[in-house]
Amino acid sequence: MTAALMLAAAAPALGQPPIEQDLAALAKSAEAQLHQSFANLAFEDFALSPVHGPLFQASAGGRILYYAPESDHLLFATIYDKNGFNLTALSQDAAARAKLKHLDPKEALLVGPPDAPLVIEFTDPDCPYCRALDRFWAAKAAEGKAVRRQIYFVSGIHPEAASKAEHILCAKDREAAFRATYAGEPSKPLNRCADGAARVEAHAKAVKSMGISGTPTLILDGQLISGFSQAEIEAWLARQRPQAKPPT
C-alpha cells in the first residue's frame, strides 16, 4: 500500500492521470502475457473489457455461467487455461456428476446389452438430432460397439413428446416401440397406461433436477455432452474399446 501511494505521488502533473497511466501499463503487460501464454493464436486487437471486479461461477440449465457483480455482467463463456484445458467443461461435468443422485435407473428405459458401456441419455421422440443419435447408436451396434442406454424422456419441448414417451413406456416391448417411434412410425393409436404416465412425470422431475434444457444430452462416464457431438462420442467409444496393438 505504501509503495503504491509513493508511486502515485511521484506521478507527473502533466500528461495522463495516474489511473490512466496504471491502466495503460497494465494493459501492455496483460497483452504481452496473452501472447506468451497463447502463442498459437493470432490476436487482432486488445482492449480493456467492460467486465470489472471478481468473476463468480454459477450453473443454470446444465450450463456454467459467470457473473461479475461489480459491473453486473453475466457471461455465457468458455474458459480455457494456457494448456488448452476447457475449465468450463470440467466444471460442467463436475456439476452433472453431483446431480446424478437425482436419477433412478429403475425409472429409466434401458436399451442395449446389460454388459455394454453405459450411456445416460436425455432424449425427445420428436427431436431430429435425437433421432439421428439413435441411428448412430444402431450403426455402432452393427459394428459390434453396442452401448447400454439409460434413457430419460424430455417432454417439455415438443407438444407430442410426452404422449409418445408414454406410448413407448406402456408398450409390451418397449425397445421395439422406441425404435419404431424414433423411426417416425409409432403404432396408432398411441399406448396409454397409468404406469407409463407416472414414468413420464418421473422423467420430467429428473430432467428438471438435472438442469437439462436441450436434447439430446448425454452423460458418458461423468462427462456431460450437450447435443449430438459425434466427435466427442466417438472419442469416448474409442476409450471404452481401445484398438488392439498390431502383432510385433
Model regions: which residues?
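Bacterial N-terminal signal peptides
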Residues: 1-9
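Envelope-exposed proteins and targeting segments
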Residues: 54, 61-63, 115-118, 145
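A short, surface-exposed interaction/processing loop segment used at functional sites
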Residues: 73-102
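Structural alpha/beta surface segment adjacent to cysteine/selenocysteine redox centers
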Residues: 116-195, 208-213, 235-240, 246-247
